[in-house]
Structures are given as structure tokens and as C-alpha cells.
């Protein structure tokens, strides 16, 4: 294999307010807990089921950390891109412990706030921790790959129509 890719993309909701920790050297890290849920209908009973996964996120990018600290709150919907990293540490009894988390570092990460203005949307850091930008609107994208709503898409193709609300349909296979 010529190379490998370590990229994580999550769209979910914060389970609590961001936790900010400062280092002695003046740097800081912002920790998030993001919930993603999947729903399905049990074939045997017809009952709707749901499973929620909790993801630990550590933001080391200074600009993205500032946006998260100022604007994100419990319940905020966010889109993040980062890398999966596992770190080793020792608990109070000296036992080795491992934590796997999504890490947002400078030049390799992204954070976009989704949802309405009441949730603080409209701010985001671009690729490479590129500061702070106003994305506007309650949803940033109409359809996958069609570009920002109300703006020019990256390609020459026109953007698609509105969202389809047929997520309750069963998969046809």
C-alpha cells in the first residue's frame, strides 16, 4: 500500500458544554463529547430502535478552540473533521489505560457549526484551522457535494433541490 489515511468526519450534537483546559505554556485544549445516533426498524417486531455513540474530541487548534469555547454549548450541532488518535496514560493505581479520541490539530482539521442561530451557528473554522468564517443560515449544505446554500458551488454544476424527507423508508434490498 502506497499510503494510508486517518480521517474522521462526525456530524452530531454536543452532550455537554465544551471543557477548556489551559497548559502551563499558555496553550489550551478544548474537549467535546459528541453524540451520533442511528435509527432503524426491527424487522421481527417492527419496533423503532436507536443506538447512540459518544465520541471524545480534543481540539488543539488555537482558532478552532476559540470558536468552540465561545459559541458551542450543550445540544449544539457540529460537523468536525480530524484524526483518530489513541493515547496511553496511567491511572492512580499505576495501571496503563488507553483513550481513543478524535483530535483536531492545526492544518489538518475542520469545525463547522450547524443548526439555527439560536444554537450559535454561523461561525466555523475552515481547513487548516483557517480562523473564523461566517457560513450563515440554518443549514450549510442542501445536498452532499452541491456546495454551500446561497453561494457558488465548487463545481460548475447547479445545486440540487431540497432535502428529501424519506429517511423512514426501508432499504430496498
Curated annotation (Swiss-Prot):
Query: What are the boundaries of the region Disordered?
Result: 113-173
GO biological process: what's one of them? DNA recombination
Q: Where is the SSB domain?
A: 5-111
Instruction: Output the CDD domains linked to this UniProt entry.
Output: SSB_OBF
Q: Which domain of life is it from?
A: Bacteria
Specify residue ranges for compositional bias: Gly residues: 115-131, 147-162
Q: Where is this motif: Important for interaction with partner proteins?
A: 168-173
Q: Name one GO molecular function term.
A: single-stranded DNA binding
Which Pfam families does this UniProt record tie to the protein?
SSB (PF00436)
* Alphabetically ordered keywords of this record: DNA damage, DNA recombination, DNA repair, DNA replication, DNA-binding
Q: Name one GO cellular component term.
A: nucleoid
Q: Which InterPro entries match?
A: NA-bd_OB-fold, Primosome_PriB/ssb, ssDNA-bd
- Describe its function: Plays an important role in DNA replication, recombination and repair. Binds to ssDNA and to an array of partner proteins to recruit them to their sites of action during DNA metabolism.
Complex formation:
Homotetramer.
Cited PANTHER family: SINGLE-STRANDED DNA-BINDING PROTEIN
Name of the protein this chain belongs to: Single-stranded DNA-binding protein
Gene source species: Cereibacter sphaeroides (strain ATCC 17023 / DSM 158 / JCM 6121 / CCUG 31486 / LMG 2827 / NBRC 12203 / NCIMB 8253 / ATH 2.4.1.)
Amino acid at each position: 500500500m502506497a499510503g494510508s489515511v486517518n480521517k474522521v468526519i462526525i456530524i452530531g450534537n454536543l452532550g455537554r458544554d465544551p471543557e477548556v483546559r489551559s497548559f502551563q505554556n499558555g496553550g489550551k485544549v478544548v474537549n467535546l463529547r459528541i453524540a451520533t445516533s442511528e435509527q432503524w426498524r426491527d424487522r421481527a417486531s417492527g419496533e423503532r430502535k436507536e443506538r447512540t455513540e459518544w465520541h471524545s474530541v480534543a481540539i488543539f487548534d488555537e482558532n478552532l478552540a476559540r470558536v468552540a469555547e465561545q459559541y458551542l454549548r450543550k445540544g449544539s450541532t457540529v460537523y468536525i473533521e480530524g484524526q483518530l488518535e489513541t493515547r496511553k496514560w496511567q491511572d492512580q493505581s499505576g495501571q496503563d489505560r488507553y483513550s481513543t479520541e478524535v483530535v483536531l490539530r492545526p492544518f489538518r482539521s475542520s469545525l463547522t457549526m450547524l443548526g439555527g442561530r439560536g444554537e450559535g451557528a454561523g461561525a466555523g473554522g475552515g481547513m487548516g484551522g483557517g480562523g473564523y468564517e461566517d457560513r450563515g443560515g440554518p443549514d450549510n449544505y442542501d445536498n452532499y457535494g452541491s456546495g454551500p446554500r446561497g453561494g457558488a458551488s465548487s463545481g460548475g454544476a447547479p445545486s440540487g433541490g431540497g432535502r428529501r424527507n424519506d429517511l423512514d423508508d426501508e432499504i430496498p434490498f
